[in-house]
């Protein structure tokens, strides 16, 4: 049996819609990162962008397990002395851009400092509400919540 190395021209990328309402953030991000990289495919090739184009809707309705919504902290630095800032998922989800919780979770599950990972991340579209503008691509609906009972809360 020969090892298959797929060329970029031979890759057929699918469009996928995932409804994130009630989904656990970490489990959703892990699944999406795997699909973005193309590791769910039997002909996966590490140096080729084989992942799907993924659309996530209702990103403002994701959930955290336990008390992580209030107790978890996200840190970033402004670049100035003493410029460490912190925020919580609750503040972000209740704020102006709630989809950033899902975007950052997926981004942090992709490889770091990789041009291919940046290209794969650009195939992710996240929307806070139930509507998206990619109907022309005829995306396939993936029922993430029914894959495992641990994927949802409540």
From Swiss-Prot:
GO terms for cellular component: cytosolic large ribosomal subunit. It holds the Pfam family Ribosomal_L13. Coiled coil: none annotated. CDD domains: Ribosomal_L13 (cd00392). InterPro entries: Ribosomal_uL13, Ribosomal_uL13_bac-type, Ribosomal_uL13_sf. Residues 131-154 are annotated as: Disordered. Keywords: Ribonucleoprotein, Ribosomal protein. One of its GO terms (molecular function) is mRNA binding. One of its GO terms (biological process) is negative regulation of translation. This protein is one of the early assembly proteins of the 50S ribosomal subunit, although it is not seen to bind rRNA by itself. It is important during the early stages of 50S assembly. NCBIfam families: rplM_bact (TIGR01066). Belongs to the universal ribosomal protein uL13 family. This is Large ribosomal subunit protein uL13. The gene is rplM.
């Amino acid at each position: 049996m020969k090892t298959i190395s797929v060329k970029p021209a031979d890759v057929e990328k699918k469009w996928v819609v995932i409804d994130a309402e009630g989904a656990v953030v970490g489990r959703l991000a892990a699944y999406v990162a795997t699909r973005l990289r193309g590791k769910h495919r039997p002909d996966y090739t590490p140096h080729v962008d084989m992942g799907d184009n993924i659309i996530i809707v209702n990103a403002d309705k994701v959930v955290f397990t336990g008390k992580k919504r209030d107790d978890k902290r996200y840190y970033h630095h402004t670049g100035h002395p003493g410029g460490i800032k912190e925020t919580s998922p609750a503040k972000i989800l209740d704020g102006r851009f709630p989809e950033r919780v899902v975007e950052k979770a997926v981004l942090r599950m992709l490889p770091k400092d990789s041009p291919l990972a940046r290209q794969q991340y650009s195939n992710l579209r996240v929307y806070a509400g139930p509507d998206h503008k990619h109907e022309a691509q005829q995306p396939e609906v993936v029922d993430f919540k029914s894959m495992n009972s641990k994927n949802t809360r409540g």
